[in-house]
């Protein structure tokens, strides 16, 4: 298996319904799955102050699944992807979970796209 990969899933709250951090060996990227109600517990995570892309998962008025996809850069106030996702708490768009893709270090800088 020359193309095999090893994912590391860290249950940040010790439960699968809580926050999950996902890393992949030999990749500088990092993914977080964070329930809406846990967003405020992530304010001290420096990697979530980086630029990144995010997915907001929820249901529409008909009960159908939907996803909103967005991107965030590093702002002048030093905030990044988590701050942008938190801004959606004021929107009419309801979401139950957020998935954020960013970097473990400042490898992304102000880039517009993740590859």
Region locations from a protein language model:
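Conserved short loop/helix modules at catalytic or binding sites
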Residues: 73-115
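GIY-YIG nuclease catalytic motif and its immediate N-terminal context
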Residues: 1-80
């Amino acid at each position: 298996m020359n193309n095999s990969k090893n994912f590391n899933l860290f249950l940040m709250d010790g439960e699968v319904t809580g926050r999950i951090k996902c890393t992949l060996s030999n990749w500088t990227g990092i993914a977080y799955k964070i329930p809406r109600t846990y967003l405020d517990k992530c304010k001290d995570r420096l990697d979530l102050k980086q630029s990144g892309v995010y997915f907001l998962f929820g249901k529409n008025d008909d009960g159908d699944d939907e996803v909103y996809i967005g991107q965030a850069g590093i702002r002048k106030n030093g905030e990044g992807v988590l701050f942008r996702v938190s801004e959606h708490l004021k929107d009419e768009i309801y979401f139950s979970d957020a998935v954020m893709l960013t970097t473990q270090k400042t490898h992304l800088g102000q880039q517009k796209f993740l590859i």
